[in-house]
């Protein structure tokens, strides 16, 4: 057993004893007709922030605040306490002359973590701290499980993620991260709404998992007696809306991929996808860099952010680099002179590149992407668009104008990590069907992330989709950069965790 496990177990043993004391206090309250769980509503007049921000107007006036008791320094006939609410903390002062001996005795029985409402007059202490002089109070929720003292005993990150409610109570930095998360998504909506985009909702359950190369979660619809999939992307439904005449659409929502968990991946994650008719991938680059700059200015007040000790500059324009040029620059391989798959495989063998399928089945495009991932990605620290992906690896994308071996696709990289993916969308139904057929062959070769055939999507393209630009951004990863957060679990309120045995 590790030292950390011993600390946690020790805390749990202490907590169990303290819980017994708290249960006894609750029983006494209930027997005296003061059951805190009989309180239905608190007539709160102000938050802690409102009291502090409006001190000059509120000085000497009576207010009612409510929050969680987080410190208590009451000895003898008077003392101070702190309560925390959504907006911060405020100091309380209680004195026997104002509340009486019995009420002060009751107040002293309150535990850290209890939720109370307080009525009193606003004043400042000799040290200048805005406080409330208590004239009345009420226990509105009894905390039966004690909080760890300053997070002692919950240093294990897994326990923090499992008990995020405690993490949020104790850790102001965690609260700030999730408040920023909300502000980031709000700013993203503002930017797109101001440009005339329409926010929509598309199915989460679908008979086909499409729009990305990923393993889906499978479930079963009992009434229809069919297997269905949790969506891995919103792309194909959003394109149907472009066909239907909604020329600018976006969706912010959850996607689900039945894959590994690490500091960059969670099986359930939030993404935005947007599509604009009569646009191409160059327009998507402009939207990406300007939207992220807008978010940075709105939420952080600057386009230069610090991430893991390095400065990242999101000021437009971002660097633009083709994948071929990136591989030439960082891997020392010039794909302009590689003639065929055989030559490419030779390079892959020399560079010790590994693939999910056998090397003999790899194409020139597979090798290019393999070299890029191995030698280039981690070099892309500042925001960079990597453009023009091989056609065989981009089944939903138009071919590159002037070079049909490539497609008009880009991915945005920051700090060596992909944050977005965009295309000049393929709208030729005949070519799209051929691409899907090729993807089916890839599945037969063992690639369980290859695309499925979606006949209804083909039908929609046959009706006719205008030239369209499309963009997808991983919101969780973007938030990591804008909040200087190392793990994706720290920007998801309740990340996916392996269940613990009932006795733990």
UniProtKB/Swiss-Prot annotation:
GO cellular component: cytosol
The keyword Acetylation is annotated on this UniProt entry: no
UniProt GO molecular function: ATP binding; catalytic activity, acting on a protein; lysine-tRNA ligase activity; magnesium ion binding; transferase activity; tRNA binding
Cofactor(s) this protein requires: Mg(2+)
Cofactor, free-text remark: Binds 3 Mg(2+) ions per subunit.
Subunit: Homodimer.
Keywords: Aminoacyl-tRNA synthetase, ATP-binding, Cytoplasm, Ligase, Magnesium, Metal-binding, Nucleotide-binding, Protein biosynthesis
SUPFAM superfamilies in alphabetical order: Class II aaRS and biotin synthetases, Nucleic acid-binding proteins
Species whose genome carries this gene: Clostridium botulinum (strain Langeland / NCTC 10281 / Type F)
Name this polypeptide is given: Lysine--tRNA ligase
InterPro entries referenced in this protein's UniProt entry, alphabetically: Aa-tRNA-synt_II, aa-tRNA-synth_II, aa-tRNA-synth_II/BPL/LPL, Lys-tRNA-ligase_II, Lys-tRNA-ligase_II_bac/euk, Lys-tRNA-ligase_II_N, Lys-tRNA-synth_II_C, NA-bd_OB-fold
Keyword presence, Cell inner membrane: no
Residue intervals passing through the bilayer: none
Residues annotated to bind Mg(2+) 2: 418
Gene: lysS
Family, per entry: Belongs to the class-II aminoacyl-tRNA synthetase family.
EC number assigned by the record: 6.1.1.6
Annotated Mg(2+) 1 binding sites: 411, 418
HAMAP family assigned to the protein according to its UniProt record, in alphabetical order: Lys_tRNA_synth_class2
Any matching Pfam family: tRNA-synt_2
Alphabetical GO biological process terms: lysyl-tRNA aminoacylation
Catalysed reaction equations from the record: tRNA(Lys) + L-lysine + ATP = L-lysyl-tRNA(Lys) + AMP + diphosphate
